[in-house]
């Protein structure tokens, strides 16, 4: 529920309770006291009507699932406000005699004020219920946000791990290239060593043959 709506609602309930008391006392007053009381009642009705309009604007700007419940409450408040307007007209008319005032005080106003009190009681219960519902919705939203944040964190971790694996793969690929180059170098060195062995062997053979030939030549002479 909107905090603005709750604030206007509390103010309206306070004004409504005050108007009920003033309407009750106004019926038994006369002269200037009655005029003063009636002026205060009219001012209170105007203030209450302004609060109802503000609540209406607040409710219509809320999501549909919350707005529908608040509009039901607003109908109750408007009905309560209309009761006060009716009482203002009756008090203003000044045509009620003492007996009529007593009957109205004992019957009409008692019924009206009782109905208003019952309406306020039901509305306050509805307000508490909506407040609890709003709290549950807020808790659900908070849980969803926490879940989303956890999901984002997990995705970021997975992305980081993927980048690490890609870098490791690139490193291994570089190692494979170096190993391949090393193999080629070793193969080339091995071939050169083999060629050198044959060359050295040939040289040694030639030297041995030369020595043998020289010895043979000296011995035969």
Swiss-Prot record:
Disruption phenotype: Abnormal cell wall organization in root hair and root epidermal cells, probably due to altered endosomal trafficking, and leading to short and branched root hairs. Mislocalization of SYP41 in root hair cells.
The keyword Metal-binding is annotated on this UniProt entry: no
Protein keywords: Coiled coil, Endosome, Membrane, Protein transport, Transmembrane, Transmembrane helix, Transport, Vacuole
Tissue: Expressed at low levels in roots, stems, flowers and leaves.
Topology feature Vesicular, residues: 220-221
Record localization: Vacuole membrane; Prevacuolar compartment membrane; Endosome membrane; Early endosome membrane
Transmembrane regions: 199-219
Gene Ontology MF term list: SNAP receptor activity
Coiled coil: 32-93
Pfam families: V-SNARE, V-SNARE_C
InterPro entries: GOSR2/Membrin/Bos1, SNARE, v-SNARE_N_sf, Vesicle_trsprt_v-SNARE_N
Side Cytoplasmic, residues: 1-198
CDD domains recorded: SNARE_Vti1 (cd15862)
Single GO BP term: intracellular protein transport
Mode of membrane association: Single-pass type IV membrane protein
Cellular compartments per GO CC: early endosome membrane; endosome membrane; Golgi apparatus; plant-type vacuole membrane
Chief subcellular location: membrane
Subunit and interaction comment: Forms SNARE complexes with t-SNAREs.
Physiological role: May function as a v-SNARE responsible for targeting vesicles involved in the secretory pathway. Involved in actin-dependent endosomal trafficking pathways associated with the vacuole within root hairs and root tip epidermal cells. Essential for cell wall organization and polarized root hair growth. Also required for the localization of SYP41 to the trans-Golgi network in root hair cells.
Protein family per UniProt: Belongs to the VTI1 family.
Name of the featured protein: Vesicle transport v-SNARE 13
